[in-house]
Amino acid sequence: MTRREFLTATASLALCARGGVSCGWRENAALGAAMRQYVANGLFGGIVCASSRGDFLCAGNRTLMPDGGPMTKNSMFDLASVGKTQTAALCALLYADGRLDVDAPFTEYIPEHVLAKENCKITVCDLATHSGGFDNSKPYMTSDSKAYFERLFAKRPVYARGERFKYACSNFVYLGLIVERLTGLGLDAAAKKLLWGPLGMKRTTWNTVVNNPDAVEFARSTYEGPIRRIGEHNDICAHLAPRPMGNGSCFSTASDMLKFCEDMLKREKFPKSYYDLQFTACFDKGGHRRSFGWDMTAEKSTFAAWTKTNFSDSAICHTGWTGSAIAVDPKRSFAGVVLASQQAGKSLTMGPRMELLELMAAVPGGKGNETLKGKEMAK
């Protein structure tokens, strides 16, 4: 931990002692205590949690130095891979509108890909479930726009289609390009028109938020490459890319992400097929179970901590490198958001994120809502 990060953690203790900042309408002492403890232990610089149960609690600081002020309901986070859910949602909307065939080879929409001339069988849905055979190598990691797309379109799968689940950011880069081509818009404009606008998500963007006073700062240990200004993309590929890409790295607030998750739960704004696609297991093999763009409860998971929660087999969840996690569980009538600035790495912070989701999902006195401790989930 750097001196700057140490000072931040020390300053956060003062906020913890005052009990954090509550913006919600439900008393959840266990949630507040857990958030304060995770900040005090240096796992996170700050956290904002919100849920359909009425939770809305903030803890810690917005920046690495305490003079940046505390986290608030307006704090704007780099979602990292949680942003993949926004790409998936846009694809689902195009599918519901009849403009996207998720069972078609993805090369029908990206004909310049090297596989287009090789009778490609990898479908759009395969990309969304990370089962098409691509690995997470990133040969397109360059700031040269021409080279970026040449390398992206030359990338080949390393496994047979449908053989296994293998998380790969390039899958969602391809999906983002498909959205652009079907809408004739950049991702930010497409999302504002089709998704964020209808949901009232006015504080979400795919663009950088360098001059936004609510932008959250992330520790140097969370990213590669040059030092970022507050509000620049944390992910190195997103930072170097010529424009926003579908692998994530949107910026948003807990309020906006709760609007998105609550709509997934209530199914009110969009066609039924939009929701069904994202809640239906499209890949179930080797202990991994995935819907279109989301992880689902299974024997294994992208992150083991998810399998140790009480979420049902209908639940969907996604996490991001920077420290966030969102979940929607129809059987528990729950939607929850954890946005945070992790400082201790993925392995040490994934369990605590799941614990915070559980603490919000649990109904006091409800059967089957016993929560697991973050340290147990992290095993």
Residue ranges and their predicted role:
Residues 5-24:
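N-terminal export signals
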Residues 17, 62-66, 342-345:
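A short acidic/small-residue loop/turn micro-motif
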Residues 25-77, 150:
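Short, conserved catalytic-motif segment at the N-terminal edge
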Residues 41-47, 67-126, 159-170, 245-248, ...:
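Short active-site loop at a secondary-structure junction
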Residues 56, 60-61, 116-315:
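Short, surface-exposed loop or secondary-structure junction motifs
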Residues 57, 323-343:
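Short, well-ordered beta-strand elements
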Residues 281, 286, 299-303, 345-379:
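Short, gly/Ser/Thr-rich active-site loops of penicillin-recognizing serine hydrolases
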